[in-house]
Each structure stands twice: as C-alpha cells, then as structure tokens.
Amino acid sequence: MPVVDDLIAANSRIRESARAVGEALSAVEVYTEPAIARAVQAEHNLYARIGAEFGMLSAAEAGKQMGSRSSAPRNLAAAAHRAKTLVAVRRGSYLAYPGFQFGPDGQPLPVIARLRDVAEANDWSEAGLVQWLCAPTTYFDGDRPVDHLATDPDRVVAVANEALAVSW
C-alpha cells in the first residue's frame, strides 16, 4: 500500500515541520509578522533544495574540494571568499558555499568572481545572487542561470548585468 505509506509519511513530515516552526517562533520574544515567517521559511527551503542538488559545503569542505591538504582547509575557502572568487550564504552561525560554483577540478568557476562584481555593482548581496542564480528566469527561457554557469558563463554574466540592474 504505497499510497497509504506515502500519506502517513507526509502527515509525519507536516507534523514535525509544524512542531519545529512553532518551537522556533516561540523562541522569538517579539511578534513576528506572518510575511516575515513565510519569507524566512522560503529562504530556508531554497537553501535546502540547493543543498540537496549541489551541496552546501562548510568552509572546511569547500577548502578540501579546492584541494587543500592543510590541517585547516577552511582557510583556503575563506581566502577565496575574501578574494571574491566564491559566494557564501549564512546558514545559522556559519557560511555555506553552494557546490554549483566549483568546476570538475574542484576549483571555483571563474565566472563566480565576475558575477560577484556584477552583484556588488548593483548593490546585491551574495544571498541575493545565489537566489537569482537558482531561480528560473525568462532570460533563459525558464531555465535557471545556474544551469548555464559552466556551459555559457559569458551569457550568464551578460544576463546578470541586465537582470540585476533592474530597479523596481
């Protein structure tokens, strides 16, 4: 009875999720607007999807991915982040490095530095850039920019220049 099992599993996930969100909201001592709670949850869900698809690496994992043999591989990732060749998003108390920005050789894709420059020039945060990269867009006929990072980096940068400069 796979359908019944699926429904039982879904019910369990819903209850667990509601309990966890309730506990988190209870920990906040001020009133939280529902729109804020929804936005935080949407961001959390997006990063979970990015993690499931590409990985969300800790600084140590990113450093190892880049080939560090140091006893502190996180330093290599931190240095690359400071040099603006990697993007990172805050996940709790640490920075997470989305796995999509690494090439097959483990090194940061050169396009990432160019995209960080575009984002910075348009006052976009790294989180905003990551979110834009992972969202479908009409600029790519419904594809996500992230799906073109390795195959058409110049086009991704050109589209970013146009899309990130839009003022609302």
Locate the predicted segments by residue:
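Non-transmembrane "mature" sequence context
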Residues: 1-168
